[in-house]
Amino acid sequence: MRVNVLGNGDWADLFKRGTEGKLLVCNMPPMQLTKEEVYASCMVDFKMMAALTEGSVNLGMYDWVLGNRPRRWMESHPAFYLKYSQNIKGFWTHVPPYAQLPGHAKSQAATNYSCGHMAVDYACRKMRATEVHLY
């Protein structure tokens, strides 16, 4: 199965709507996409959780795959969890060894692990993608 990972970087324009495969987006997609087009929005940081909580960002139209820090956010903000629980496709809390940089505290590994890295890891390990395209 092919999985496309769409980030917000300079090369996101290379992604064409209707491209074969399932689509994972990093946080907020760089273009308007429907729920039907997006398999899930992947989020890993407190910054996105805070933006969703305050209402400055709306991703309620998508399913979510959330990392370690969003999971911790939900544990400390139960009202937020209840409000958005229907959006949560799942939590992906695996942090690979390469995210643990030499000389950094072990707790820093999840911080070093970006949304794009998590989306690719999720595509390969959970979705069992045989082909992953990054945009």
Language-model features: locations:
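Histidine/lysine/aspartate-rich catalytic loop segments that bind and position anionic ligands
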Residues: Y135
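Acidic/Gly/His-enriched mid-domain segments of enzyme catalytic cores or analogous surface patches
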Residues: D10, R17-E131
